[in-house]
């Protein structure tokens, strides 16, 4: 069965980086976009940047690591629109580079709560809603670090690997409801999060990347637009990794 044309989208982590660019690109395509972020002011700036575009952008605050916050967000959205056609979950944190023997419980739990629990909470609410109109698309952001070992980033890689398997399993569970679930595992993209990498690491990555550059946020947003389009109707449970050839 074909999915409905995407008209309403929720972007988590839409206040900056890839989430911001995706929000504006979808708004440019005429969609109604809810921009959600822990930093409400940043989400509001994204929404303001969408003024004058064919679509409509609205800002919301959310802490994806808290199930009650996510539930409150979806409750609010349900009062404002009849359906949710697209969830794009980009909200995430990087954390510090640390070896397992120096990794404390709080660091581990924080990484899991934002990067894995957050995806689960958002997917659970989205599926409950999408099932009512038997159509929808979910795009979960993992990372190239979920596809290859990244020493020093054990909790991050583990959480993002969990996102991939959650998405694959969910894709099979909800296919009968005409819901598609796909993952994007970006390589190193030119966003503010690059500043959080250890000194010298970006140069190391460039040397290892066959295309010798970082990704551009517009390239990632273009992939999301494709996955939201009728052209991607036969895609579900797949991991797409734009990474410049870093992992093949």
Language-model region placement:
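C-terminal substrate-recognition "lid" of short-chain dehydrogenase/reductases
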Residues: 120, 213-242, 247
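Canonical Rossmann dinucleotide-binding motif of NAD(H)/NADP(H)-dependent dehydrogenases/reductases
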Residues: 2-34
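Active-site helix of classical SDR
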Residues: 123, 159, 167
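Alpha-helical segment proximal to the catalytic Tyr-Lys
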Residues: 128, 172-176, 233
């Amino acid at each position: 069965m074909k999915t409905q044309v995407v008209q309403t989208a929720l972007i988590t982590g839409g206040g900056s980086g890839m989430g911001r660019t995706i929000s504006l690109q979808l708004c440019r395509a005429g969609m109604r976009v809810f921009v959600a972020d822990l930093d409400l002011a940043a989400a509001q700036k994204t929404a303001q940047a969408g003024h004058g575009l064919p679509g409509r952008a609205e800002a919301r605050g959310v802490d994806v690591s808290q199930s009650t916050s996510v539930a409150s967000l979806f409750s609010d959205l349900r009062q404002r629109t009849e359906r949710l056609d697209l969830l794009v979950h980009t909200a995430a944190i990087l954390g510090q580079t640390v070896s397992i023997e120096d990794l404390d419980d709080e660091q581990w739990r924080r990484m899991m709560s934002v990067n894995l629990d957050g995806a689960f909470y958002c997917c659970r609410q989205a599926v409950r809603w999408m099932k009512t109109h038997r159509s929808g698309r979910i795009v979960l952001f993992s990372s190239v670090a979920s596809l290859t070992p990244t020493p020093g980033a054990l909790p991050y890689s583990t959480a993002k690997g969990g996102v991939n398997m959650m998405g694959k399993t969910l894709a099979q569970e909800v296919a009968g409801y005409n819901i598609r679930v796909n993952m994007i595992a970006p390589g190193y993209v030119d966003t503010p999060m690059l500043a959080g990498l250890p000194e010298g690491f970006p140069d190391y990555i460039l040397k290892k990347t066959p295309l010798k550059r970082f990704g551009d946020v517009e390239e990632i947003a273009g992939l999301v637009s494709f996955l939201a389009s009728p052209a991607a109707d036969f895609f579900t449970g797949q991991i797409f990794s734009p990474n410049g050839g870093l992992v093949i």
